[in-house]
UniProtKB/Swiss-Prot annotation:
The modification 3-methylthioaspartic acid is found at D89. This is Small ribosomal subunit protein uS12. Residues 111-125 have a biased composition (Basic residues). GO terms for biological process: translation. Pfam families: Ribosom_S12_S23 (PF00164). InterPro entries: NA-bd_OB-fold, Ribosomal_uS12, Ribosomal_uS12_bac. Keywords: Methylation, Ribonucleoprotein, Ribosomal protein, RNA-binding, rRNA-binding, tRNA-binding. The gene is rpsL. With S4 and S5 plays an important role in translational accuracy. Interacts with and stabilizes bases of the 16S rRNA that are involved in tRNA selection in the A site and with the mRNA backbone. Located at the interface of the 30S and 50S subunits, it traverses the body of the 30S subunit contacting proteins on the other side and probably holding the rRNA structure together. The combined cluster of proteins S8, S12 and S17 appears to hold together the shoulder and platform of the 30S subunit. Part of the 30S ribosomal subunit. Contacts proteins S8 and S17. May interact with IF1 in the 30S initiation complex. HAMAP family: Ribosomal_uS12_B. Belongs to the universal ribosomal protein uS12 family. One of its GO terms (cellular component) is small ribosomal subunit.
Length: 125
C-alpha cells in the first residue's frame, strides 16, 4: 500500500489497453494488396476450407484477413479494404476483408444481411 506522500510524488499509473487489431493503427479500415489468397482449415472441432488472404497494408504491415461470404473474386495483387474482427476458429486471423469495396465484389444472390456482404438490393418483379 502506497503512502499519501508516495502518491503525491508519483501517482497511480493507468493501465493501457492493448489493441486487438494493431495493424489498423486506430483507423476503422485500411487498404492493402493481396500477396497470397488461400484456403485453410479451422481448429477442432470445426471442419471446413476457410478462405483467407494475406494482405500487405499501406502502412507496410502484412496480415492474414478472412474473406467472408460464398465465393469471391480475389487473387494476388487485388486491392482490398480490411476491417477489424477476428475469426475464432482460425488462429492468427484478426481481420476481415470488406466485401463490395475496392477490387472485392459483393456476394451474388444475397438476400439477407446484404450490407455485410456488399450486395445490392434485388429488383422487384
Amino acid at each position: 500500500m502506497a503512502t499519501v506522500n508516495q502518491l503525491v510524488r508519483k501517482g497511480r499509473t493507468k493501465r493501457t489497453a492493448k489493441s486487438s487489431v494493431p495493424a489498423l493503427e486506430a483507423c476503422p479500415q485500411k487498404r492493402g494488396v493481396c500477396t497470397r489468397v488461400y484456403t485453410t482449415t479451422p481448429k477442432k472441432p470445426n471442419s471446413a476450407l476457410r478462405k483467407v488472404a494475406r494482405v500487405r497494408l499501406t502502412n507496410s504491415y502484412e496480415v492474414a484477413s478472412y474473406i467472408g461470404g460464398e465465393g469471391h473474386n480475389l487473387q494476388e495483387h487485388s486491392v482490398v479494404l480490411i476491417r477489424g474482427g477476428r475469426v475464432k476458429d482460425l488462429p492468427g486471423v484478426r481481420y476481415h476483408v470488406v466485401r463490395g469495396a475496392a477490387d472485392t465484389a459483393g456476394v451474388d444472390k444475397r438476400r439477407q444481411g446484404r450490407s455485410k456482404y456488399g450486395a445490392k438490393r434485388p429488383k422487384k418483379k
